[in-house]
């Protein structure tokens, strides 16, 4: 080979080693399956129907519409395929670019990752059966790669060799799916090819089945090709070191040589028959293991050199929720192993994405097998399969998280190793010679015989196994001794645990008892708070009643004054006006009878001299009686005054009774405030409570901390002293604050009592004066009535005596005329008298109207029945309620931090209802009530002027 070609190849390899590529990540979302449709689970994943956008959105909240879009999480990947994307599109977009690199000599890997029942196996294998020698539309990536591989190889003239293997990782155990012998001695082991020694070839087993008809030279040409071969055995160590650039080597795995796509499909179907599958509640054909289908390509690239490239097609088992899948016993163990390996794979992805120093590849066999594919020297594509249903939202989010992080992993792809044709032929020839010698030895003897060299290899293997057995025995003995020590430690730990559990149970019972006490205390405080609220309402009601009574009293006094002063004054003025009218009318008309009497006297001068004195006296007396005799108005006035007196007396009695009741209520309230409000047994209750808490703390301290009795006792004494002093100071301060806040209220109540007493005294004085005035009026009216009756009797007597004399004079015409004139004038006087009587009757009606207005005012100004009933009901409820001191419940000890969970109590226990009360009650002065409004609900608020 020329030197410049060697230099060019070396520089190309260095450039390839320095190039870094990210892992290609694709997301495939299937449609909802029958189980999800039956469960009526909504779609929470937003993807294109086929492909297009590179973003996947998932809504993990219960919101819809714009809010759901705003709160949804979006993941960006390289490719996104929706439910309508078919198998051919997946292969064309994801697997075909890697296949082209595989043909160029790069190592490539395709991984399918996701939860169970999302279509991983369908994506990787699909329908692997052939129909008339052709693939179906549902065929997956592996069958399509098989056909495309041989189509591409047949289109070239170069020599090639294709081998394939199929391994399974089940419960962290490797298994060869193409091995039908099930030989337990051929356990698959994982080695790093860089750490293997060339001298260990004898310990390596064959990678192909021992079948005599499978030997051939291993080459395949396009035109001259030997008969088909099923399998060929190659040397273990030297071949792997020279063939592959990978650092991971699986010992004892069988590799089958295939010459066309049909044989590759048969190998795939053979392995699928041995794969572990089972039925769960989430999937009828659930894969219970991870599988890796590997295709090895030896392709002639330059004369006698062959380029070795490898493609790993990985079908990972799906993660599953054991409670939802219904896995039990063996299935639960399988699910645990699957989840554990996938969890390790997730940690590896996170470490690689975060560029951590330590990558936990060796924590799981799965991650060790994928060490080259993740962060190694291969080109890798990851297909994440997800479900769109809401019931799988958590698993979908986890899958998308891993896929998004895997996108940041960088690999350094390198071309596969070069192998000389002579080395490849020499390895195949040595394998054929070894198989031939074993076959001849077996054929010439009755039993199974082998050559000396082969026997020596087996002896060496036996010695190595014996050495390993001895080392294992020593390890077993050391582990047994360690196990015994651990058992002793475990027994001691169990005893300590039982002791601690008993203590914890006692503490839990104590805590429950204390919680019950706290509940009782909370109940008592709630009742006390309710009582305080009711007393506040009663206080506000009483204040409103006092205010209404004051307003009613002022209005009543003003209305009575207005009625009495204005009514009587107007009546007096109208009376004077009427009397003046009568006087004027009497003076205007010539009503004097002196002229008539003089005429009669002159006429009867001779005959009436004997009775002149009596007639004159009678006339004078009559005129005097007419002027002085009271009319019917005086009688009605007397009756009206009597009725007014009785009404005033009844009103005075009613008002006195009401004021007496108010005064008694105020006296009772003052007595309660002075004797009972602040003289309760708060201090005694606190002392008893503190003493019981102190005894409880002391007893618990003696039981739990017996070795620290003296220190705990001193601490408890000091704590008790501090707590007692602080509680006493707090109680005294509360009582002083309550007294200082209530003192203005008490002063105003005392002042209101004084005002009520003054009002009562003024009312009694007014009643006495009005009664005395009315009595004087009645006496005067009685005296005038009596004198009028005497005068009337005298006039009647004289009239009777004069009647006889008048009869004697009735025959005289002139006398008749004069008498007629006198009668006319007398009639006129009677008319005037009747007018006066009518006027006085109308005046009496005015007095009646005045009396009705006074009664109406009294009725309107009387307190409403509803207010009286509400106040009486409230006072009856307060008097009927018996207040008892709060019972002591003991002191709550400090809660210990326990290892096991204790049921948390409701947070309302720690919130005392007494603390929520507003004790800053403000009593509004009557002087300032004009500037303050009382709301319908809530405390008084000042007006903004």
Curated annotation (Swiss-Prot):
Feature: compositional bias, Polar residues: 234-243
GO CC aspect terms: cytoplasm; mitotic spindle; nucleus; spindle microtubule
Record's keyword terms, sorted: ATP-binding, Cell cycle, Cell division, Coiled coil, Cytoplasm, Cytoskeleton, Microtubule, Mitosis, Motor protein, Nucleotide-binding
SUPFAM superfamilies registered for this protein in UniProt: P-loop containing nucleoside triphosphate hydrolases
Annotated region (Disordered), positions in chain: 190-243
BP term (GO), one: microtubule-based movement
A Pfam family: Kinesin
A GO molecular-function annotation: microtubule binding
Compositionally skewed regions (Low complexity) per UniProt: 193-208
Positions of ATP binding: 114-121
Domain of life: Eukaryota
Keyword Cytoplasm annotated: yes
Location, primary (coarse class): cytoplasm
The UniProt record lists the keyword Cell inner membrane: no
Alphabetized Gene3D superfamilies for the sequence: Kinesin motor domain (3.40.850.10)
Subcellular compartments: Cytoplasm, Cytoskeleton, Spindle
Family statement: Belongs to the TRAFAC class myosin-kinesin ATPase superfamily. Kinesin family. BimC subfamily.
Functional description taken from the UniProt entry: Elongates the mitotic spindle by interacting with spindle microtubules to generate an outward force pushing spindle poles apart. Following spindle assembly, CIN8 and KIP1 apparently act to oppose a force, possibly generated by KAR3, that draws separated poles back together.
Protein name per Swiss-Prot or TrEMBL: Kinesin-like protein CIN8
């Amino acid at each position: 080979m020329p030197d410049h070609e060697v230099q060019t190849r070396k520089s190309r390899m260095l450039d390839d080693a320095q190039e870094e590529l990210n892992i290609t990540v694709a997301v495939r979302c299937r449609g909802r399956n029958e189980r999800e449709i039956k469960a009526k689970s909504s779609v929470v994943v937003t993807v294109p129907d086929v492909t297009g956008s590179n973003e996947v959105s998932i809504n993990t909240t219960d919101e819809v519409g714009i809010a759901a879009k705003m709160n949804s999480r979006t993941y960006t990947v390289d490719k996104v395929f929706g439910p309508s994307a078919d198998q051919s599109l997946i292969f064309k977009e994801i697997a075909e670019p890697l296949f082209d690199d595989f043909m160029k000599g790069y190592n490539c890997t395709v991984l399918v990752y996701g939860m169970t029942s999302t279509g991983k196996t369908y994506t990787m294998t699909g329908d692997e059966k052939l129909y008339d020698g052709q693939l179906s539309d549902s065929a997956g990536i592996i069958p399509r790669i098989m056909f495309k591989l041989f189509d591409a190889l047949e289109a070239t003239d170069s020599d090639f060799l294709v081998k394939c293997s199929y391994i399974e990782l089940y419960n962290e155990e490797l298994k060869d799916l193409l091995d039908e012998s099930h030989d337990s001695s051929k356990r698959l082991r994982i080695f790093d090819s860089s750490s293997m020694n060339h001298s260990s070839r004898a310990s390596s087993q064959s990678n192909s089945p021992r079948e005599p008809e499978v030997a051939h030279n291993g080459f395949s040409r396009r035109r001259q090709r030997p008969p088909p071969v099923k399998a060929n055995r190659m040397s273990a160590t030297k071949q792997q070191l020279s063939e592959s650039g990978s650092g991971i080597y699986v010992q004892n795995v069988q590799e089958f040589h295939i010459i066309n796509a049909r044989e590759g499909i048969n190998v795939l179907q053979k392995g699928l028959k041995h794969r572990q599958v089972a039925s769960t509640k989430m999937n009828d054909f659930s894969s219970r293991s991870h599988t890796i289908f590997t295709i090895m390509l030896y392709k002639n690239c330059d004369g006698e050199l062959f380029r070795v490239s490898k493609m790993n097609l990985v079908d990972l088992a799906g993660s599953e929720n054991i409670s939802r899948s219904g896995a039990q016993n063996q299935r639960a163990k399988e699910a645990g192993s699957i989840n554990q390996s996938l969890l390790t794979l997730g940690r590896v992805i996170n470490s690689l994405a975060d560029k951590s120093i330590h990558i936990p590849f060796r924590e799981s066999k799965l991650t060790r097998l994928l060490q080259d594919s993740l962060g190694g020297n291969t080109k890798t594509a990851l297909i994440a399969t997800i479900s769109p249903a809401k019931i799988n939202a958590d698993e979908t989010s986890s899958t998308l998280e891993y896929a998004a992080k895997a996108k940041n992993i960088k690999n350094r792809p390198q071309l596969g190793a070069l192998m000389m044709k002579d080395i490849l032929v020499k390895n195949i020839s040595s394998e054929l010679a070894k198989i031939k010698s074993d076959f001849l030895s077996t054929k010439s003897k009755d039993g199974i015989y082998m050559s000396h060299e082969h026997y020596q290899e087996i002896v060496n293997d036996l010695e190595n196994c014996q050495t390993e057995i001895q080392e294992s025995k020593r390890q077993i003995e050391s582990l047994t001794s360690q196990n015994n020590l651990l058992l002793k430690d475990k027994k001691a730990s169990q005893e300590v645990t039982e002791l601690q559990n008993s203590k914890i149970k006692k503490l839990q019972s104590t805590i429950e008892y204390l919680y019950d006490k706290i509940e009782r205390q909370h109940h008592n405080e709630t009742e006390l708070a309710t009582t305080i609220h009711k007393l506040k309402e009663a206080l506000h009601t009483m204040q409103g009643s006092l205010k209404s009574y004051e307003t009613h009293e002022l209005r009543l006094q003003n209305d009575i004054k207005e009625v009495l002063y204005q009514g009587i004054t107007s009546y007096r003025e109208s009376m004077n006006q009427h009397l003046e009218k009568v006087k004027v009318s009497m003076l205007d008309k010539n009503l004097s009878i002196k002229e008539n009497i003089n005429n009669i006297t002159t006429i009867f001068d001779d005959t009436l001299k004997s009775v002149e004195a009596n007639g004159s006296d009678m006339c004078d007396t009559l005129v005097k009686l007419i002027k002085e005799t009271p009319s019917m108005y005086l009688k009605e006035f007397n009756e009206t005054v009597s009725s007014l007196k009785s009404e005033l007396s009844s009103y005075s009695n009613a008002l006195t009774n009401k004021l007496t009741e108010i005064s008694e209520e105020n006296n009772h309230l003052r007595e309660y405030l002075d004797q009972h409000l602040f003289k309760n047994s708060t201090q005694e209750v606190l002392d008893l409570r503190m003493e019981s808490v102190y005894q409880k703390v002391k007893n618990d301290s003696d039981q739990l901390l017996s070795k620290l009795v003296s220190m705990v006792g001193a601490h408890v004494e000091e704590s008790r002293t501090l707590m007692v002093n602080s509680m006493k100071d707090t109680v005294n301060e509360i009582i002083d604050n309550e007294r200082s806040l209530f003192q203005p209220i008490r002063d105003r109540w005392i002042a209101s009592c004084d005002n009520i007493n003054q009002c009562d005294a003024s009312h009694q004085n007014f009643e006495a004066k009005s009664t005395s005035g009315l009595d004087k009026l009645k006496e005067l009216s009685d005296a005038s009535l009596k004198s009028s009756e005497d005068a009337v009797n005298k006039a009647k007597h004289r009239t009777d005596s004069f009647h006889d004399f008048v009869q004697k004079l009735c025959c005289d015409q002139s006398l008749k005329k004069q008498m007629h004139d006198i009668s006319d004038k007398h009639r006129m006087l009677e008319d005037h008298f009747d007018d006066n009587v009518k006027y006085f009757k109308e005046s009496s009606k005015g007095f009646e109207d005045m009396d009705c207005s006074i009664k109406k005012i009294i009725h309107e100004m009387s307190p409403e029945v509803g207010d009286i009933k509400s106040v009486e009901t409230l006072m009856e409820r307060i008097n009927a309620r018996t207040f008892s001191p709060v019972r002591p419940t003991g002191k709550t000890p400090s809660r210990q931090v326990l290892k096991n969970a204790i049921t948390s109590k409701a947070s309302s226990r720690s919130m005392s209802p007494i603390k929520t009360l507003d004790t800053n009650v403000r009593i509004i002065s009557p002087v300032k009530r004009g500037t303050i409004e009382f709301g319908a609900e809530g405390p008084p608020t000042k007006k903004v002027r």
